[in-house]
């Protein structure tokens, strides 16, 4: 049976990638359908109850700057907010929020149900409809076919998912949910490279059986941050602390003595796990010189007794999990509510994707989230947003859009995936970005909101707020330029208390703010420079843009030099076989990856600077040398 209505975009999956992928085209005015196996798990936090962190918080800010949902949802659901690396430079400062799972899921579902142009339908998808090498719809388990002009697949860990607890295993997409076996089988028939990855989750603990009195307490920041540029502190629910315990030698001995019952160490699990979120088995074996690992006990919400022990992800048998938990301080009598487990699932080689996240093999079919080899809610959501945007643009007959590495962490993420691929679950770090001083959390809206406005992704209120902020920044910078303090000034004594070395010549407000020891807050407490802006976001931007102006300009100059070749396009029809001076190995890699630009080609493993020079010469010789906006 074919559904009577034809959609512009169909999104398969209602996780963090799927929700952003569905909201984007709907906001752009396209008729969108979100297909999910269970509407009650829309926006479900399957693993850790937190959003943000190093690199991840940057992604959340970028999603928000483009009108996405994640930051707004966590502002309504965050029960502990912290700014990480607050004592370091602005490039690596990151916001992290502990979440109430129920409140977060409610915020996501409310947003989806109130979004114009978006329909939601509960049914498992078993097939992607492909005609003339183009995705044109999705088929559900009940035999109902939905037709569309583009399809975004965000299946998470559900494709041929297999859950492991000890040496026992069974099919499942996550605990309590079935595996998408039929869809996985169908996708394996397509012209796409597929492999297996693994991830895991710790057991959930009963808070009533934890002795919190003997544990170190960790509070959130006294001055609460917000995640969304449109957010406000009064949107946050009640704030509560987390607690800290540690593994010990008893814990480690138990783990070492149980490896013969571990699915990872007996070869039952073949997929690679996340390097930067290893299981407790891996931590004990890889860091054998350490006799203790820190474990964070994170409440799962305000209305639940469940506690997430961050740091003991495991697939060991249940009796071993009980022993691990009870071996730690404060957890001697703790009960487990849900066992930890590992899950193995299909993912597709992201090198088979265009930077728009459209598959190279099938037109109109976009992939986003964990099926591209990533790990993390934030990475999934960023991909979902990008895939949804490009699915919509394709339907509208408009030029595709994706961010470059110097524009957004989303650009770094996608370029890494599409160019290098991954053999283990990929996560974002600030260290992956060459231009991280320009890709800060605080300026994500300055980088991306004007683009979002052009694409039709943001509403009038956000656009007005953005323009007001930009006016405030410009006006305040100009004001500080115009105010001067000289050696005879009546305010000199107060100013000299702020600076490490007394003023010997006149200085403007901008000059003073460039000094490392002078902050905007301190400067504007001096009568000559008062009053301070009441717009905190604009005030922060004024201080950073002045204090780091020289570094920012240097990095921008670097980008301009790099862009001379970064954006030199390689036409899809370019024939590498005709470039005889390339080695067979280089030629094979270029033909395999089909990079869209010289910049992308230069990041492929094994492609030398000499090979890039040869490519440029041949592009020029064939009259194909042209630069474009990527």
Curated annotation (Swiss-Prot):
Sites binding NAD(+) sit at 273-287
Q: Signal peptide position in this chain?
A: none
List GO BP terms, alphabetically. Answer: tRNA methylation; tRNA wobble uridine modification
Database matches in PROSITE patterns: GIDA_1, GIDA_2
- Give UniProt keywords alphabetically: Cytoplasm, FAD, Flavoprotein, NAD, tRNA processing
GO cellular component annotations of the record: cytosol
Extract the GO molecular function terms from the UniProt entry. Answer: flavin adenine dinucleotide binding
The keyword tRNA processing is annotated on this UniProt entry: yes
Q: Which annotated residues bind FAD?
A: 13-18
The cofactors it requires, by name, are: FAD
Where would you find this protein in the cell?
A: Cytoplasm
Q: Its family?
A: Belongs to the MnmG family.
HAMAP family, per this entry?
MnmG_GidA
Q: How does it assemble?
A: Homodimer. Heterotetramer of two MnmE and two MnmG subunits.
Role according to the record: NAD-binding protein involved in the addition of a carboxymethylaminomethyl (cmnm) group at the wobble position (U34) of certain tRNAs, forming tRNA-cmnm(5)s(2)U34.
Protein's name according to its UniProt entry: tRNA uridine 5-carboxymethylaminomethyl modification enzyme MnmG
Organism (species): Actinobacillus pleuropneumoniae serotype 3 (strain JL03)
UniProt gene name: mnmG
């Amino acid at each position: 049976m074919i559904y009577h209505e034809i959609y512009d975009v169909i999104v398969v999956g209602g996780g963090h990638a799927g929700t952003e992928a569905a909201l984007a085209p709907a906001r752009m005015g396209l008729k969108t359908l979100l297909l999910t196996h269970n509407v009650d798990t829309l926006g479900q936090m399957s693993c850790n109850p937190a959003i943000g962190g190093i690199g991840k918080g940057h992604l959340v800010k970028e999603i928000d700057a483009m009108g996405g949902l994640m930051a707004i949802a966590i502002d309504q659901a965050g029960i502990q907010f912290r700014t990480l690396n607050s004592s370091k430079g602005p490039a690596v400062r990151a916001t992290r929020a502990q979440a109430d799972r129920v409140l977060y899921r409610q915020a996501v579902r409310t947003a989806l149900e109130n979004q114009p142009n978006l329909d939601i339908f509960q049914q498992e998808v078993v097939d992607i409809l492909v005609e003339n090498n183009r995705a044109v719809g999705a088929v559900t388990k009940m035999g109902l076919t939905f037709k569309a002009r583009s399809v975004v697949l965000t299946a998470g860990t559900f494709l041929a998912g297999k859950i492991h607890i000890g040496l026992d295993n069974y099919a499942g997409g996550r605990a309590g949910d079935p595996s998408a076996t039929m869809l996985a089988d169908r996708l394996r028939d397509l012209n796409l490279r597929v492999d297996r990855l693994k991830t895991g989750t710790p057991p959930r603990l009963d808070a009533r059986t934890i002795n919190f009195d003997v544990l170190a307490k960790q509070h959130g920041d006294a001055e609460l941050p917000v995640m969304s540029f449109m957010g406000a502190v009064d949107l946050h629910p009640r704030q509560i602390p987390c607690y800290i315990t540690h593994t010990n030698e008893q814990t480690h001995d138990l783990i070492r003595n149980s490896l013969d019952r571990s699915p990872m160490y007996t070869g039952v699990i073949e997929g690679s796990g996340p390097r930067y979120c290893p299981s407790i088995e891996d931590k004990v074996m890889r860091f054998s010189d350490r006799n203790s690992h820190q474990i964070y006990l994170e409440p799962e919400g305000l209305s639940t007794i469940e506690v997430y022990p961050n740091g003991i992800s495991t697939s060991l048998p249940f009796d071993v999990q009980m022993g691990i938990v009870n071996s730690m301080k404060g957890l001697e009598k703790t009960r487990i509510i849900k066992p930890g487990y590992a899950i193995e699932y299909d993912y597709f080689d992201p090198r088979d994707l265009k930077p728009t996240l459209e598959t190279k093999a099938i037109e109109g079919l976009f992939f986003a989230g964990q099926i591209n080899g990533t790990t993390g809610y934030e990475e999934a959501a960023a991909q979902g947003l990008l895939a949804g945007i490009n699915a919509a643009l394709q339907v509208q007959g408009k030029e595709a859009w994706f961010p470059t590495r110097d524009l957004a962490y989303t650009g770094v993420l996608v370029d890494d995936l599409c160019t290098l691929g991954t053999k283990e679950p990929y996560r974002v770090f600030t260290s992956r970005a060459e231009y991280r001083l320009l890709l800060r959390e605080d300026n994500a809206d300055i980088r991306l909101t004007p683009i979002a406005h052009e694409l039709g992704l943001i509403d009038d209120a956000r656009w007005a707020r953005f323009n007001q902020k930009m006016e405030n920044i410009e006006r305040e910078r100009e004001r500080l330029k115009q105010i001067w303090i000289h050696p005879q000034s009546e305010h000199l004594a107060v100013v000299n208390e702020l600076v490490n070395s007394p003023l010997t010549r006149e200085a403007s407000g901008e000059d003073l703010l460039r000094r490392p020891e002078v902050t905007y807050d301190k400067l504007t407490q001096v009568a000559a420079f008062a009053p301070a802006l009441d717009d905190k976001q604009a005030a922060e931007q004024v201080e950073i843009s002045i204090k780091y102006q020289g570094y920012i300009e240097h990095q921008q100059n670097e980008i301009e030099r790099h862009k001379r070749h970064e954006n030199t396009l390689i036409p899809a029809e370019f024939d590498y076989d005709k470039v005889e001076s390339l080695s067979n190995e280089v030629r094979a890699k270029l033909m395999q990856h089909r990079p869209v630009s010289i910049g992308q080609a230069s990041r492929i493993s094994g492609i030398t600077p000499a090979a890039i020079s040869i490519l440029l010469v041949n592009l020029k010789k064939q009259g194909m040398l042209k630069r474009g906006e990527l």
